[in-house]
Amino acid sequence: MFKSFDGLKLSNSELEGRYIIANRDIDIGESILKCKSYFAVTCEDFKKNSCYNCIKLIKSPSPQQVPRCFGCNEVWYCSEKCKQDNQAKHQHYECAFFNNIKSPKLIQNSKLDFDSYSEIRIILGLLSRYYQDKLLNNKFNSSIIINNQQDDEEDFIKDTLDGVLDLVENDINEETNSVAKEYIDNIIEYIINILKLTINNNSNDNNNNNNNNNNNNNNNNNNNNNNNNNNNNNIEELIKLIRPLIQKVRCNQFGIWTKNDKCIGMAVSPSSSYFNHSCIPNCESVRDGSDMTFKSLFPIKKGDQINISYLALDKSTKRRRDYLKFGYYFHCQCPRCNSTDIDPTGKLEDSLDNWISKFYCHQKKCTGLYYSKLKLSLQSLTNIDNHEIQLSCSTCNDQLIVNSNFYLNKPNY
């Protein structure tokens, strides 16, 4: 699965599900994995000034110069090239579904808040691909989806729709999270109405066109009935997918952040989702729009699990666990969160806090981590003079100069 990424091995356990372990010793600053998001959307409050294709801020001086989709009026682009590259996946049912997101028929009775529309768009986008790929048997061209970047295609993992459908999900119900369940129920109802409105309207348009072009009423009626039955069956199959997709996406999505630490988009990348969380991660995701590169923060031994963090790390154990429980529906049992259980004196907790805090970005309000852009081995560190190791923040790209002692005295856990 991981192609040329020879240092990775996919493992599985009943407690942790699927996760990635190091298949060899991994050095500082290694590019562990490169992924192109299978699907990404801009956030609702940034959709007019962020490109829907590359998920980067638009630098155009005026809104009138920003290309957009006039079919749905829900997506904007940084250039005509990005708009053209995106048409292969957007011009079919995704555009039609998006066009009805703000339908007056739906909004007037809606219980949703502003931010809900970002989640609705990512679910509708995935449903549109399933509808086109699985139900209509109109396959996507994967080479088009990755924007025709043939030069670096081999460096990136290719994710698929089947990979999304195979993602692990956490059941969100009255017992696990009653507030989230009610919220999701409202989103599901809204999406169902969009599906029915879109598919039935498109079917009615097609039926009317057929009737106008053919005088055989009996044949037309039979064809119309068959189309209606097929549409109802397709809608029912799509409806069955909505809740599982929401639960999969909520547990596995990645935020796409600007250098100012603003979340402008959300992405789903199945291969990236194999990285489990730890509050003392040994790996960090470096994002470039909807693309991600995972870099090792410090040396990783063969057999160690490779982890990333799902949250800002400069919080107390309680706040971190509460955030993960509410947002990702699990109780964190990482070494840092469990440190007080292992060592009631607090010494282990202090040593782990001190170790990982060295990697926190120094810029105010930035939640990124410092990593080395260059691959460095522990052996080579002894030959590096003071102030020769340059680190970069994964979010804001702030630079930090450290010496070889920065990587020494890593606590055992």
Curated annotation (Swiss-Prot):
Start and end residues, zinc fingers (MYND-type): 51-95
Domain SET: 6-311
Similarity annotation: Belongs to the class V-like SAM-binding methyltransferase superfamily.
EC number per UniProt: 2.1.1.-
Entry's Gene Ontology cellular component terms: nucleus
Enzyme class: transferase
Coiled coil, from the record: 216-243
GO biological processes: methylation
Organism per entry: Dictyostelium discoideum
Signal peptide per UniProt: none
Matching PROSITE patterns: SET, ZF_MYND_1
GO molecular function, one term: zinc ion binding
InterPro entries the record matches: H3K4_H4K5_MeTrfase, SET_dom, SET_dom_sf, Znf_MYND
Keyword Transcription attributed: no
Keywords, sorted A to Z: Coiled coil, Metal-binding, Methyltransferase, S-adenosyl-L-methionine, Transferase, Zinc, Zinc-finger
Official protein name in the record: SET and MYND domain-containing protein DDB_G0273591
Region feature (Disordered): 205-232
Function description: Probable methyltransferase.
